[in-house]
């Protein structure tokens, strides 16, 4: 594959209702210092990506009403890299919109663009180890036509996370310290406690981190197979953005089914690669 431009998209559209009244509609959790005494969660998210991706190519995708506050937050990225979704269409709509934006901005069919997707509400224990994990999965999706994700080795039988079942013949002894690539067998919904205990004991199940990685051309092609209306919409939105037809973009986006990226694409994709995280992680949602 020719020279690849790496792009990152931080999903930051949530309102953080769990943290009310500290987190409010126009000052949500991603703009609070919840996991660091000095940095907001968005600052932390951007800083984790900087070792791998130039800040000029780091984007934050959010709601229209949060754009001013995020642009004023001093994240060290260009103002135009704060992208507003026209309305809410769950994570599938969010990432379809992001892909269309990148196709319009960078041109081409996306084959020279790889995209890392993270969220602004994760607690990550070690930025260096995180960067090593992300670098590994980016290498995978840049070398073969697969979608990618990061799996978190479970530390307890949690009923609060979805799980990823990986194909592992023998669980490596260094699984907790060396990022390795595995093929995903299945995505599992949040389980009851007895099932979660089975997953943890089995050794080939990981928490679903909700982080995704792909070459954009591969992403669009996979949507062509999983949900052709989404593949068509991504291309149509990119074309409308290129010619400056934002009302047309909004009309297309509003017509999308509101569905998660797991349900719409990841569970139906031809092949998904997973790299195990080697860092402490939690979703504080």
Question: Where in the sequence are the language-model features?
Answer:
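Structural signal for hydrophobic packing residues in well-ordered secondary-structure cores
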Residues: 46, 50-53, 74, 102, ...
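Catalytic core of tubulin tyrosine ligase-like
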Residues: 163-285
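Solvent-exposed alpha-helices and their adjacent loops that cap or buttress functional pockets
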Residues: 1-4, 11, 51-53, 107-111, ...
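Conserved donor-nucleotide/metal-binding helix-loop-beta segment in metal-dependent transferases, i.e.
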Residues: 123-158
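Conserved N-terminal catalytic core of the sugar/cofactor nucleotidyltransferase
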Residues: 1-11, 17-28, 35-119, 123-131, ...
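Short, well-ordered, mixed-charge alpha-helical segments that flank or form enzyme active sites
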Residues: 68, 91-92, 123-127, 156-161, ...
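Conserved beta-strand scaffold positions in the cores of enzyme catalytic domains, especially
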Residues: 31, 82, 147-149, 274
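Short beta-strand segments
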Residues: 10-12, 61, 116-119, 149-153, ...
């Amino acid at each position: 594959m020719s020279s690849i431009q790496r792009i990152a998209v931080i999903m930051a559209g949530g309102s953080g209702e769990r943290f009310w009244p500290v987190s409010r509609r126009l000052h949500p959790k991603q703009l609070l210092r919840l996991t660091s005494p000095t940095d907001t969660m968005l600052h932390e998210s951007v800083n984790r990506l900087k070792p791998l991706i130039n800040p000029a190519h780091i984007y934050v995708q959010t709601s229209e009403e949060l754009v001013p506050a995020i642009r004023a937050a001093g994240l060290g990225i260009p103002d135009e890299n704060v992208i507003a979704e026209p309305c809410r269409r769950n994570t599938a709509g969010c990432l379809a919109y992001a892909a269309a934006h990148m196709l319009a901005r960078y041109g081409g069919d996306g084959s020279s663009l790889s995209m890392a997707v993270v969220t602004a509400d994760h607690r990550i224990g070690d930025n260096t180890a995180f960067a090593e994990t992300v670098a590994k999965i980016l290498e995978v999706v840049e070398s073969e036509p697969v979608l990618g994700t990061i799996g978190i080795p479970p530390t307890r039988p949690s009923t609060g996370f979805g799980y990823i079942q990986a194909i592992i013949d023998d669980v490596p002894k260094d699984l907790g310290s060396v990022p390795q690539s595995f093929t995903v067998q299945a995505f599992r919904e949040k389980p009851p406690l007895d099932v979660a205990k089975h997953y943890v004991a089995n050794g080939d199940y990981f928490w679903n981190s909700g982080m995704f990685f792909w070459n954009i051309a591969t992403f669009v092609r996979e949507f062509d197979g999983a949900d052709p209306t989404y593949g068509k919409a991504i291309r149509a939105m990119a074309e409308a953005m290129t010619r400056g037809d934002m009302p047309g973009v909004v009309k297309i986006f509003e017509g999308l089914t509101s569905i998660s990226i797991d349900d719409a694409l990841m569970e139906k994709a031809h092949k998904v690669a997973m790299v195990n995280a080697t860092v402490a992680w939690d979703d504080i949602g």
